[in-house]
C-alpha cells in the first residue's frame, strides 16, 4: 500500500552514525548503503539500557525491568504472535536465489525504530522506557543510579499531557502498524530482487522490543543479518541508541558474536530516498494555487545542542546535507522555491538545535510569508510528531501568525520508490557483512576534566529535567507547602 495525502490535505487513514561516543572505535560512514564493522566504544550497564523481558532478568540476575502496563502484560503473548505472523514470515523457498551460495544462506533484515504507545494506558510506561535510556538523559557514570528515578519522575508528570496528544490522534501511535506494513512491503521488494529474507521489527521503547526481534532471529537461525535503522539521518539518540542495544547483545551472545552483520548507519544521501522526498514535495506543491510562491519548510526532530558540540553527534551536519540534496533534486526539476530548516519537539530549558520550529513559524508570518509547505524530514512514518505536533499545533500557530495557506508533505510510509530503494540498500550491504568487532571500553566518560564534566553534565541534566516538569511540578510543590 502506498501512503499518500489527498489533495484536501487529509491523511489516508490506512497510513494511520557515525558517532558512538568520543572514545574508542567508531562507525565509519556507510555511504550508499555499504556496511561497516562495529567497534564497541561505549559501555552501558544492562540494567540501565536494555528493555529486557522478565525471563531474561531471572537468568541474568539483573535488577532492571521494563515498566509495563497491566493491559500489555495480558496481551504480551498475543503481541509476540501477531508480530511473528505479520513480519517474520519467510519467502517461498522455491523462489530462485541469486546464486547457489546465496540460496544456502538465511538472510535477515532487522528494522529498528522508536516505538510508540498503542493505547493511552501505554503512555506512561512508554515514557519511562524513553527517559530510562542513558542516550536520552545523559548522566555521568557516577550518577547513573539516578537514571530510573528520574525516568519515573519525568514520565509520571509528563504522561497526562502526552495522553492528551495521543487522544487527539485516535488514542495511540500508528507507528507499529505502519512499520509492520513497511516490513512486509520490503519483504516483497526484496523478493522481486531475487532475495529471500526474513524481516524483523525491533522497537527501542515499546513492543516489539529489539530484544524480542533478536530472540526470533536466533530461533530462525539467520546466517547473515542486515541492520537498517528507519532513521534517514544518524543521531546518538535514535540509531545510536538502538545500535548500542545490539552491541550489548553481541558482547554476551556467542551466536551474534559470530554472525555476519551489516549496519546501514544512515541513508539520507541515497538517490532513491532523495527522489522519493522530492516527488512528495512536488506533488504537494502542485495543490497550491501559486506553487512558485510557497516556502518549503523542513521541520526536523531536534536534539540538545550538547549532543553535537560535546558528544560529536553528526545529526545536524547530516540534516543540512539532506536538505541540500533534496533541494538540489527539486532544482533539477525546475522547482526553485525558497526553503528553510527548523527543529521541533524540544523540551526543557536547555538549548537544543536552532532555529526552533515554533519561533520560525511566527517570524515567517511577521515577514509576510503567506504560503507554507511543511516537510517532516526526520520521519518516514506518521506518528504523534507529525499527526499532532505538526498537523495541529504548528498549523494553528502558523495560521495565527499570518500564514494563510498551509500544506504538509506526508511521511514516506510505504511509497513504492522509497521501499524499493531500501531494498537496494539491503542488497548492496550484504556482500560486506562480517562479524561485529567488540572492544573493551575505557571506563572514563570523556576527555574532559572530571570536575568540569561532572558539574556540567550532572547538575545541568538534573536542573533541565526537573524544570521540564514545570509548571505542574511547581504547582504540586506549592500546593503541598500551602
Curated annotation (Swiss-Prot):
- Any idea what this protein is called? Ferrochelatase-1, chloroplastic
Entry superkingdom: Eukaryota
A GO MF annotation of the entry reads: ferrochelatase activity
Task: Indicate whether Cell cycle appears among the record's keywords.
Answer: no
Biological role: Catalyzes the ferrous insertion into protoporphyrin IX.
Q: Which InterPro entries match?
A: Ferrochelatase, Ferrochelatase_AS, Ferrochelatase_C, Ferrochelatase_N
**Keyword tags:** Chloroplast, Heme biosynthesis, Iron, Lyase, Plastid, Porphyrin biosynthesis, Transit peptide
**GO:BP terms for this protein?**
heme biosynthetic process
Task: Report which reactions are catalysed by this protein.
Answer: heme b + 2 H(+) = protoporphyrin IX + Fe(2+)
List the EC numbers from the record: 4.98.1.1
Q: List the pathway annotation.
A: Porphyrin-containing compound metabolism; protoheme biosynthesis; protoheme from protoporphyrin-IX: step 1/1
- Where is this protein found? Plastid, Chloroplast
Q: What are the annotated GO cellular component locations?
A: chloroplast; mitochondrion
Family that this chain belongs to: Belongs to the ferrochelatase family.
Instruction: Just give the chief location class.
Output: plastid
Question: Top EC class per UniProt?
Answer: lyase
Amino acid at each position: 500500500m502506498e501512503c499518500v495525502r489527498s489533495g484536501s490535505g487529509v491523511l489516508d487513514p490506512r497510513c494511520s552514525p557515525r558517532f558512538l561516543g568520543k572514545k574508542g572505535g567508531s562507525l565509519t560512514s556507510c555511504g550508499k548503503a555499504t556496511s561497516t564493522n562495529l567497534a564497541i566504544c561505549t559501555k552501558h550497564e544492562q540494567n540501565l539500557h536494555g528493555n529486557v523481558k522478565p525471563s531474561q532478568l531471572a537468568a541474568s540476575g539483573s535488577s532492571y525491568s521494563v515498566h509495563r502496563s497491566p493491559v500489555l502484560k495480558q496481551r504480551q503473548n498475543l503481541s509476540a504472535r501477531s508480530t511473528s505472523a505479520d513480519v517474520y514470515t519467510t519467502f517461498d523457498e522455491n523462489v530462485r536465489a541469486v546464486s547457489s551460495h546465496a540460496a544456502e544462506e538465511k538472510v535477515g533484515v532487522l528494522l529498528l525504530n522508536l516505538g510508540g504507545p498503542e493505547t493511552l494506558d501505554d503512555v506512561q510506561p512508554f515514557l519511562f522506557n524513553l527517559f530510562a535510556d542513558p542516550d536520552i538523559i545523559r548522566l555521568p557514570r557516577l550518577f547513573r543510579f539516578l537514571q530510573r528515578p528520574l525516568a519515573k519522575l519525568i514520565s509520571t508528570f509528563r504522561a497526562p499531557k502526552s495522553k492528551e496528544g495521543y487522544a487527539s490522534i485516535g488514542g495511540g501511535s500508528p507507528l507499529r502498524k505502519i512499520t509492520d506494513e513497511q516490513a512486509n512491503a520490503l519483504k516483497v521488494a526484496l523478493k522481486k530482487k531475487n532475495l529471500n529474507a526474513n524481516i524483523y521489527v525491533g522497537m527501542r521503547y515499546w513492543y516489539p522490543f529489539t530484544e524480542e526481534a533478536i530472540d526470533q532471529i536466533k530461533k530462525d537461525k539467520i546466517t547473515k543479518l542486515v541492520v537498517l535503522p528507519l532513521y534517514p539521518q544518524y543521531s546518538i539518540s535514535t540509531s545510536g541508541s538502538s545500535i548500542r542495544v545490539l552491541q550489548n547483545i553481541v558482547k554476551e551472545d556467542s551466536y551474534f558474536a559470530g554472525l555476519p552483520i551489516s549496519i546501514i548507519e544512515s541513508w539520507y544521501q541515497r538517490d532513491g530516498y532523495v527522489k522519493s522526498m522530492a516527488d512528495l514535495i512536488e506533488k504537494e506543491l502542485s495543490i497550491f494555487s501559486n506553487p512558485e510562491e510557497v516556502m518549503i519548510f523542513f521541520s526536523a526532530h531536534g536534539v540538545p545542542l550538547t549532543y553535537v558540540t560535546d558528544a560529536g553527534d553528526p545529526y545536524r551536519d547530516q540534516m543540512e546535507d539532506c536538505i541540500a540534496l533534496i533541494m538540489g533534486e527539486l532544482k533539477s526539476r525546475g522547482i526553485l522555491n525558497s526553503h528553510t530548516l527548523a527543529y521541533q519537539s524540544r523540551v526543557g530549558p536547555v538549548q537544543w538545535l536552532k532555529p526552533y520550529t515554533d519561533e520560525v513559524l511566527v517570524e515567517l508570518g511577521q515577514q509576510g510569508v503567506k504560503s507554507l509547505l511543511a516537510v517532516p524530514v526526520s520521519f518516514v512514518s506518521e506518528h504523534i510528531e507529525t499527526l499532532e505536533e505538526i498537523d495541529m499545533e504548528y498549523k494553528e500557530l502558523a495560521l495565527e501568525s499570518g500564514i494563510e495557506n498551509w500544506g504538509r508533505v506526508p511521511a514516506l510510509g510505504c511509497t513504492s520508490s522509497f521501499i524499493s530503494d531500501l531494498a537496494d540498500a539491503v542488497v548492496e550491504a550484504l556482500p560486506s557483512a562480517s562479524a561485529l568487532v567488540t572492544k573493551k571500553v575505557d571506563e572514563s566518560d570523556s576527555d574532559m576534566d572530571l570536575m568540569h564534566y561532572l558539574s556540567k553534565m550532572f547538575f545541568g541534566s538534573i536542573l533541565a529535567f526537573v524544570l521540564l516538569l514545570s509548571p505542574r511540578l511547581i504547582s504540586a510543590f506549592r500546593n503541598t507547602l500551602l
